[in-house]
Amino acid sequence: MTFQFQGPFSSFSSSNSIITHRCTYDVFLSFRGKDTRYNFTGDLDNALHKKGINTTFIDVDDDDLETKRDEELSETLVKAIEGSRTSVVVLSRNYASSTRCLDQLVKILECKQTKGQVVLPVFWKVDPSDVRHQRKSFGKALAQLEDNTKMQSWKTALKNVANLSGWHIARGKGQESRKLKRNFETNVLDLEMSCIFDKTVVKIHPLKQD
């Protein structure tokens, strides 16, 4: 099944969806750098910035991160996610092989529950059901981390994010893929403009695409 966002975003069913705390950023981007930094996520980040939407992210594949302690990164990560109005989670083939990506996801879903943060999952050339049930690349990645004490929280987070209404960009022709990317960028812009200027509550509806 391929999901699309129905716009404009006009209502949200959960009472937790209204964000009452002050936000430093409009959008936090969670992604695996080597998969999408120089295509989908990079394009989305540029498109949002051009519209004046303030984004933030921590690229887990950035070489500069090797010099930082885990505690320092964790503190930076928590502040970035908690200070964001919306999180876009780009789930790609190698996402689950990064413990830092998985930790981001756990924190994002925590903020969804406690702060009403809007979470938009993007399934970038992966099947949502494989994310939900940890199959294929997601299952293989977690198998290599099996002795980690955070395993259950990671599995729960992957299952929960895959159950959210989201956007599935499957493997396909270049023109079709670019069109889906543009449509997603437009819908995120609509969402952010609604939250920032109209102060309306937002709802995302999954639509099945034949």
Regions found by a protein language model. Name each.
Residues 1-210:
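Intracellular innate-immunity NLR/STAND receptor architecture
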